[in-house]
UniProtKB/Swiss-Prot annotation:
Organism: Bos taurus (Bovine)
Pfam families: CDC37_C (PF08564), CDC37_M (PF08565), CDC37_N (PF03234)
Cell location: Cytoplasm
Region of interest (Disordered), residue spans: 124-145, 344-380
Residues that bear N-acetylvaline: V2
Post-translational modifications reported in the UniProt record: Constitutively sumoylated by UBE2I.
UniProt name for this protein: Hsp90 co-chaperone Cdc37
N6-acetyllysine PTM sites in chain numbering: K80, K156
Phosphoserine carried by residues: S13, S122, S379
InterPro entries: Cdc37 (IPR004918), Cdc37_C (IPR013873), Cdc37_Hsp90-bd (IPR013874), Cdc37_Hsp90-bd_sf (IPR038189), Cdc37_N_dom (IPR013855)
Taxonomic classification: Eukaryota, Metazoa, Chordata, Craniata, Vertebrata
Quaternary structure, from the entry: Probably forms a complex composed of chaperones HSP90 and HSP70, co-chaperones STIP1/HOP, CDC37, PPP5C, PTGES3/p23, TSC1 and client protein TSC2. Probably forms a complex composed of chaperones HSP90 and HSP70, co-chaperones CDC37, PPP5C, TSC1 and client protein TSC2, CDK4, AKT, RAF1 and NR3C1; this complex does not contain co-chaperones STIP1/HOP and PTGES3/p23. Forms a complex with Hsp90/HSP90AB1 and CDK6. Interacts with HSP90AA1. Interacts with AR, CDK4, CDK6 and EIF2AK1. Interacts with RB1. Interacts with KSR1. Interacts with FLCN, FNIP1 and FNIP2.
Gene Ontology terms: cellular component: cytoplasm
Any one biological process term the GO annotation gives: protein folding
Length: 380
């Protein structure tokens, strides 16, 4: 049966207690609380003194009992008086011990009968709070460290990675990874991705699709390890068990990811080819640049049609006639561009003898040599 008598008298101030109009209610509550705290502190101090006195008395009783046992073992004639003294002392100490225990019991009863107040109604259930924090992640490796790690791994295991990339059956892949668990890592997946792009650039599409399948296998294993928060080497068998017994929806997800990956590979390969073509065209353009840094092809295409015909015909006289009919400013502008691009080299008679045989060899552009001794250079 529950004893509810402890609730009969509770010393708790109520905000609705009526006080004299001339008395500040807040101050009255504060004074009451202060007096109550002082009484509690005094009571606690007396209780601690009783505890210390009782413990000290018990220690003396135990010490006296030990001496009595030692004296009884000795059983000497001269120790009889000492034995009687210790027995009397032990009797007195036991009497004091009972007195201390009686005082402690009275103190406990007094404490139990004390009315509850705002400070004793409840006690702390916890002295501190524990908050789970996310474990500190290892510092991310720098780009240089990752590249060096990848390079070292590939140099050591490239042959094994390529062998895995050529497998197709689930059982074969699982067995090969079981025999070479070091391949179950991010470096293998990265190498397979790059290999797929290289194969697509080389137009080896069928082989690319084969390697792409194994790339997605490795990526699925890594994703499974990340979701389970375990090392990939500890869960790759779980992936193969899951994929071999997977339902239709799971297999469709795998195949969808595979097709999306192949599309991304084709896109990356296309961009790489376009970039290579642009770089090649830029190199060729730089090789064509004339002494003034202009591209002869671009300059030729920007010339008026009548000047283009002159260069197509490689006729100097025709070129001179066309220039004489043009506005002097336009003629100077176009001929200067021809000189800067190398389409036209003025004052080239000195090299006529050496280069005469090479002139007119099929080049659609006018070179810096004359064909005959009576041809004149154009100076603009």
């Amino acid at each position: 049966m529950v004893d509810y008598s402890v609730w009969d008298h509770i010393e708790v101030s109520d905000d609705e207690d009526e006080t004299h109009p001339n008395i500040d209610t807040a101050s009255l509550f504060r004074w009451r609380h202060q007096a109550r705290v002082e009484r509690m502190e005094q009571f606690q101090k007396e209780k601690e003194e009783l505890d210390r006195g009782c413990r000290e008395c018990k220690r003396k009783v135990a010490e006296c009992q030990r001496k009595l046992k030692e004296l009884e073992v000795a059983e000497g004639e001269g120790g009889k008086a000492e034995l009687e003294r210790l027995q009397a002392e032990a009797q007195q100490l036991r009497k004091e011990e009972r007195s201390w225990e009686q005082k402690l019991e009275e103190m406990r009863k007094k404490e139990k009968s004390m009315p509850w107040n705002v400070d004793t109604l409840s006690k702390d259930g916890f002295s501190k709070s524990m908050v789970n924090t996310k474990p500190e992640q290892a510092e991310e490796e720098s780009e240089e460290v990752r590249e060096q790690k990848h390079k070292t791994f590939v140099e050591k295991y490239e042959k094994q990675i390529k062998h895995f990339g050529m497998l197709r059956r689930w059982d074969d892949s699982q067995k090969y990874l079981s025999d070479n668990v070091h391949l179950v890592c991010e470096e293998t997946a990265n190498y397979l991705v790059i290999w797929c792009i290289d194969l697509e650039v080389e137009e080896k599409c069928a082989l690319m699709e084969q390697v792409a399948h194994q790339t997605i296998v490795m990526q699925f294993i890594l994703e499974l390890a990340k979701s389970l928060k375990v090392d990939p080497r500890a869960c790759f068998r779980q992936f193969f068990t899951k994929i071999k017994t997977a339902d239709r929806q799971y297999m469709e997800g795998f195949n969808d990811e595979l097709e999306a990956f192949k599309d991304r590979v084709r896109g990356r390969a296309k961009l790489r080819i376009e970039k290579a073509m642009k770089e090649y065209e830029e190199e060729e353009r730089k090789k064509r640049l004339g002494p003034g840094g202009l591209d002869p092809v671009e300059v030729y295409e920007s010339l008026p049609e009548e000047l283009q015909k002159c260069f197509d015909a490689k006729d100097v006289q025709m070129l001179q006639d066309a220039i004489s009919k043009m506005d002097p400013t336009d003629a100077k502008y176009h001929m200067q561009r021809c000189i800067d691009s190398g389409l036209w080299v003025p004052n080239s008679k000195s090299s006529e003898a050496k280069d005469g045989e090479e002139a007119g060899t099929g080049d659609p552009l006018l070179e810096a040599t004359s064909k005959s001794g009576d041809e004149k250079d154009v100076s603009v």
